[in-house]
């Protein structure tokens, strides 16, 4: 059995963590960073880039670079690249594959299982899509866990057995959640959760982009939003400015050669955004976090004064205005500073993986369903069977009847949401229960059962009590993918993994060949006086053969050329060694001759006799 990891699959960045010796450790990726950008790019040579490498080339490859795909999970969104369509789970699977690969590289063994986190306010469709992404990436998804719950698990286990109430304020790149949890004696229980799946750091970035574009248009009369490459540069500059404003009062944004004017003269963007101006243009976004905050307190029936700790989660909570608002909403409570908002969710996910694998004992996680579940009844009414903030897993049944005489079947339409009319809520799926015995309306008894598992994924069944006929649906409209499609995507992902590995190996061969030719030529140049002209020509000929092979696509030809160059290099090295050895022998011979002369008994070393002095001595 392979290892299990915890994964925070984020809108902007993702993190993977593993349990080692009972402690959760965040794993650095192949680039050495503890966070991996959730960006996937399809290079024009067919290579699939994920993470920082995808982010680095985004400006030059805008149409083939995909970011913030998490916002499309649970929808029918697709992107077409090279006449092939990719769904949101497929793109997310690429990020998961990289995290899996980096974890395996660190651990030195296979990673087979994972706990993956999702925003607490994700509906069934989005949860199912996330689970599908894990499956496509070759992972057995042990559990889908709410991000605030994972954060509280990571934070709360260090706080001992004393029962405490924790507020988790989670503002990520694309989603917002706020949850109230009670932790004590190894039990983590979610009391209530609320949020907004369309609110996150991306929206703050977009406000800066709009501000910059408006400023530039006013100054130069050019709309940068119409230029894809310029727009991508604005997005990257906006993200950097937002981060800078978390620690500085102002941020300078300078983008040279952003575009050209009508006469093809280059134009430059140079603006300064102050923190005050930034907060002014994003105030309405900040205000949107207040409603879910108040809703959670109301649903949990808890006052602000009863909150013991406040935990900020998600990189977007580093914005000064966000932390100030949380302090204001909690009557002056300072958010906990000892938690890394980028990593705490992945750490909690790794702990939950440990719980599910039996590696962490005496911990019980009690999560809730974020939205009410029900069916459409006569008049389009939403009849709820499971209310929001119900602890999961759970199962509820209710008996319904027919609306017409001799009705042969009933259509069960499953919805998720809080609105009174079904049409205003999210349709999760529908199925038909046929074969109902003819009877006056109101007589047949049809039992509808909702079953939510620990992942928050819903199954619904309907049973005619008279005939015993039953029909069940596991809601899978979330990703719009059948099991056959998922299996195909798994194979496709495996194939691409092999292709990517092959491409990497081929590039390594090319890099090695190029380096070999360069180093060999440099060595010849540095040792010209020691190498015969004939040997130099042979080596240069072999190096040219490598150059020619590198122009083509035949990897075996490159390897053969390198092998021949290597052989010629060894011959050259041998010749140099022999020449130096011979030269050394000659020098040794000369030394030996001198030594023999010194052995003459009539010769005295270093004694000089002055003739005049000798004459004086003789006189004495």
UniProtKB/Swiss-Prot annotation:
Biased segments, Acidic residues type: 607-620
Disulphide bonds in the chain: none
Induction or repression: By stress conditions e.g. heat shock.
Basic and acidic residues biased stretches: 492-511
Modified residue annotations for Phosphothreonine: 175
Comp. bias (Low complexity): 583-597
Leader peptide range in chain numbering: none
Domain of life from the UniProt record: Bacteria
Pfam families noted in UniProt: HSP70
Keywords carried by this UniProt record: ATP-binding, Chaperone, Nucleotide-binding, Phosphoprotein, Stress response
Chain segments carrying region Disordered: 492-519, 583-620
Function description: Acts as a chaperone.
Protein name: Chaperone protein DnaK
Gene transcribed to yield this protein: dnaK
């Amino acid at each position: 059995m392979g290892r299990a990891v915890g994964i925070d699959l984020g809108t902007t960045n993702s993190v993977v963590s593993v349990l080692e010796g009972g402690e959760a450790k965040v794993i650095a990726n192949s680039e050495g960073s503890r966070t991996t950008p959730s960006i996937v790019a399809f290079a024009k040579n067919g290579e699939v880039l994920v993470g920082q490498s995808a982010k680095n080339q985004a400006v030059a490859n805008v149409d083939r670079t995909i970011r913030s795909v998490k916002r499309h999970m649970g929808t029918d969104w697709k992107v077409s690249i090279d006449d092939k369509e990719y769904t949101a789970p497929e793109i997310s699977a690429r990020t998961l594959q990289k995290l899996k690969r980096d974890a395996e590289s660190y651990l030195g063994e296979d990673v087979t299982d994972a706990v993956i986190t999702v925003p607490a306010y994700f509906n069934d469709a989005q949860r199912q899509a996330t689970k599908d992404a894990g499956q496509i990436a070759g992972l057995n998804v042990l559990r889908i866990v709410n991000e605030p719950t994972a954060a509280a698990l990571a934070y709360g286990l260090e706080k001992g057995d004393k029962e405490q109430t924790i507020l988790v304020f989670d503002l990520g790149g694309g989603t917002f959640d706020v949850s109230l949890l009670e932790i004590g004696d190894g039990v983590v229980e979610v009391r209530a959760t609320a949020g907004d799946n369309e609110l996150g750091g991306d929206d703050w970035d977009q406000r800066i982009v709009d501000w910059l574009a408006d400023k530039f248009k006013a100054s130069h009369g050019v709309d940068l939003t119409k230029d894809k490459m310029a727009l991508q540069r604005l997005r990257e500059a906006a993200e950097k400015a937002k981060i800078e404003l978390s620690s500085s009062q102002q941020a300078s944004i300078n983008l040279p050669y952003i575009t050209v004017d009508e006469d093809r003269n280059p134009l430059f963007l140079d603006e300064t955004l102050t923190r005050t101006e930034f907060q002014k243009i994003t105030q309405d976004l900040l205000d949107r976090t207040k409603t879910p905050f108040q809703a959670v307190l109301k649903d949990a029936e808890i006052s602000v004064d009863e909150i013991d700790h406040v935990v900020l989660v998600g990189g977007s909570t580093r914005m000064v205005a966000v932390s100030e608002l949380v302090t204001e909403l909690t009557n002056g409570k300072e958010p906990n500073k000892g938690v890394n908002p980028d990593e705490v969710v992945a750490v909690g996910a790794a702990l939950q993986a440990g719980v599910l694998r039996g590696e962490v004992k005496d911990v019980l996680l009690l999560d809730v369903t974020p939205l009410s579940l029900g069916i459409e009844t006569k008049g389009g009414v939403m009849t709820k069977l499971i209310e929001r903030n119900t602890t999961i897993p759970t199962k509820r049944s209710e008996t319904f009847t027919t609306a017409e005489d001799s009705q042969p079947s009933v259509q069960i339409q499953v919805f998720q949401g809080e609105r009174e009319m079904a049409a205003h809520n999210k349709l999760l799926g529908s199925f038909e229960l046929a074969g109902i015995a003819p009877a006056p309306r109101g007589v047949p008894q049809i039992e509808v059962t909702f079953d939510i598992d620990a992942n928050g994924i819903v199954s619904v069944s309907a049973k005619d009590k008279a005939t015993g006929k039953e029909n069940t649906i596991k809601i899978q409209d979330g990703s719009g993918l059948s099991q056959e499609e998922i299996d195909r995507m798994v194979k496709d992902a495996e194939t691409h993994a092999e292709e990517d590995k092959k491409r990497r190996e081929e590039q390594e061969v090319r890099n090695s060949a190029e380096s070999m030719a360069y180093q060999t030529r440099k060595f010849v140049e540095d040792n010209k006086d020691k190498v015969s002209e004939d040997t130099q020509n042979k080596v240069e000929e072999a190096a040219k053969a490598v150059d020619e092979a590198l122009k083509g696509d035949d990897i075996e030809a490159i390897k053969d050329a390198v092998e021949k160059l290597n052989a010629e290099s060894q011959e050259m090295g041998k010749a140099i060694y022999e020449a130096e050895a011979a030269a050394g022998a000659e020098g040794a011979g000369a030394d030996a001759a001198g030594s023999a002369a010194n052995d003459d008994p009539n010769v005295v070393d270093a004694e000089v006799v002055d003739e005049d002095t000798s004459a004086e001595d003789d006189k004495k």
